[in-house]
Amino acid sequence: MIAIYPGSFDPITLGHLDIIERGGQLFDLVIVTVLRNPNKQPLFSVEKRVEQIRECTQHLSNVEVDSFTGLTVEYAKLRNAKVLLRGLRVLSDFEKELQMAHTNVTLWDGIETVFLATAKEYSFLSSSIVKEIAKFGGSISHLVPKNVAQDITLYYS
């Protein structure tokens, strides 16, 4: 079974990577899909984020990385995926993600959403927090993959 793990991943964090790795143990193929979010001003281009994620997932043989503009369910149909993979950190994530899961089913009844609870060590972690810490010169090496930490440090230097 194919699962899509969609997100803006700006930047990808160790929490995201944990969901990807665990999803890879559950599904035949996990396609990490970098989406363009018109409501966010990105740190890195979509192409750069795809490159970053490919580098930090190269050890996972059943993970692909792609990008897409449009509705996630349309991309899932295109890739013959029946599952959207989502990570949950806190209760507010669940409320938002459950609403989105129900909305997606109204768009295509062939899609299911599988939620994975984030590992406790990443329950506080978000891309926004990483950017905030890096912007003020704090260490982010324990929050993002090494290649991404280097890119972010370069960006803010």
Curated annotation (Swiss-Prot):
Coiled coil: none annotated. Its EC number is 2.7.7.3. Substrate binds at residues 8, 40, 72, 86. The gene is coaD. Homohexamer. Belongs to the bacterial CoaD family. This is Phosphopantetheine adenylyltransferase. It catalyses: (R)-4'-phosphopantetheine + ATP + H(+) = 3'-dephospho-CoA + diphosphate. The record marks 16 as: Transition state stabilizer. One of its GO terms (biological process) is coenzyme A biosynthetic process. InterPro entries: Cyt_trans-like, PPAT, Rossmann-like_a/b/a_fold. Its cofactor is Mg(2+). Reversibly transfers an adenylyl group from ATP to 4'-phosphopantetheine, yielding dephospho-CoA (dPCoA) and pyrophosphate. Its main location: cytoplasm. ATP binds at residues 8-9, 16, 87-89, 97, 122-128. It holds the Pfam family CTP_transf_like. Pathway: Cofactor biosynthesis; coenzyme A biosynthesis; CoA from (R)-pantothenate: step 4/5. It is an enzyme of class 2 (transferase). GO terms for cellular component: cytoplasm.
